[in-house]
């Protein structure tokens, strides 16, 4: 361990001048390929020669092409499953007709025989989808809007009634709703106009004083009772013969209570 350089592959040589030179081991001789194996290297570089060799039917190249084809199929299936499940760049059947799909599938089969490298087939595999998957997607797309339209249809239309009858029924229902809304608006406006006219006839602190409908009714009742007392008439429900002063006091108390409630709301 003291002199590690003695065991190293490099040898130190002392020259005449005293300088030390390092001598490395000679590299291993380069192995040249024999002429027997040269056609195989040339074959993998040129795909046309590969196709011709496969056509000749030599056993070694046939076995090699079968291995490459099996690897190509396995890699292709994995890539196809991944690409189709992720639903990226899905091809719709409406955009691609059946004739184009068949031509694409035939080209893919031919390319598997011609191309010797599996990497090229892997890159081109995600662009072509099986015909069965495209047909299934076409059926699903055609069935989806049909089911939605059936759910959207009314029960009467599904029962077999013509579209004209359904349209007429809807028009009649809309007319009835419009008439009912008009009657309700007329009733509300009539009641409001009657209370406004009564408010102008009953006594109040000012002509423009705002009173609720309940206050207007109370003041109107007491006002009528007070006028009846002046005419020596008794309009009380229990016939207790209220005096004119009591009727005026009730009107005054109602007006005061209404004024206080309005101030609290403001």
Curated annotation (Swiss-Prot):
MF terms per GO, please?
A: DNA-binding transcription factor activity; E-box binding; protein dimerization activity
Q: Name one GO biological process term.
A: heart development
Report whether Transport shows up as a keyword of the record.
no
Q: Which domain of life is it from?
A: Eukaryota
Task: Alphabetically list the UniProt keywords.
Answer: Cytoplasm, Developmental protein, Differentiation, DNA-binding, Neurogenesis, Nucleus, Transcription, Transcription regulation
What subcellular compartments does it reside in? Nucleus; Nucleus speckle; Cytoplasm
What is reported when this gene is inactivated? Morpholino knockdown of atoh8 causes two phenotypes. The severe phenotype displays a shrunken head, reduced eye size and fused somites and most embryos die within 3 days. The mild phenotype displays an abnormal brain shape with smaller eyes, a curved body axis with indistinct somite boundaries and frequently reduced or no circulation. In addition, the yolk extension is hardly visible starting at the beginning of tail straightening from the 17-somite stage.
User: Where are stretches of biased composition, namely Basic and acidic residues?
Assistant: 150-160
Name used for this protein in its record: Transcription factor atoh8
Give the organism's phylogenetic lineage: Eukaryota, Metazoa, Chordata, Craniata, Vertebrata
């Amino acid at each position: 361990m003291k002199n590690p350089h003695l065991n190293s592959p490099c040898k130190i040589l002392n020259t005449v001048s005293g300088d030390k030179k390092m001598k490395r081991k000679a590299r291993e001789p380069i192995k040249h390929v024999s002429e027997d194996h040269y056609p195989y290297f040339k074959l993998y570089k040129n795909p046309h020669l590969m196709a011709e060799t496969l056509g000749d039917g030599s056993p070694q190249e046939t076995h090699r092409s079968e291995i490459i084809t099996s690897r190509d199929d396995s890699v292709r299936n994995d890539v196809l499953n991944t690409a189709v499940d992720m639903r990226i760049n899905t091809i719709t059947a409406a955009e691609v007709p059946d004739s184009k799909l068949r031509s694409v599938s035939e080209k893919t089969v031919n390319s598997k025989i011609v191309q010797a490298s599996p990497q090229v087939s892997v890159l081109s595999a995600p662009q072509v989808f099986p015909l069965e998957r495209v047909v299934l997607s076409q059926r699903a797309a055609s069935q989806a809007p049909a089911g939605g339209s059936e759910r959207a249809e009314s029960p009467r239309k599904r029962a077999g009634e013509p579209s004209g009858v359904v349209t007429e029924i809807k028009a009649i229902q809309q007319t009835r709703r419009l008439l009912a809304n008009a009657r309700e608006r007329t009733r509300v406006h009539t009641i409001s106009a009657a209370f406004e006219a009564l408010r102008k006839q009953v006594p109040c602190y000012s002509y423009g004083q705002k009173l609720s409908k309940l206050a207007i009714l109370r003041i109107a009742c007491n006002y009528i009772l007070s006028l009846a007392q002046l005419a020596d008439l008794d309009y009380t429900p229990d016939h207790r013969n209220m005096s004119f002063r009591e009727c005026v006091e009730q009107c005054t108390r109602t007006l005061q209570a209404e004024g206080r409630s309005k101030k609290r709301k403001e």
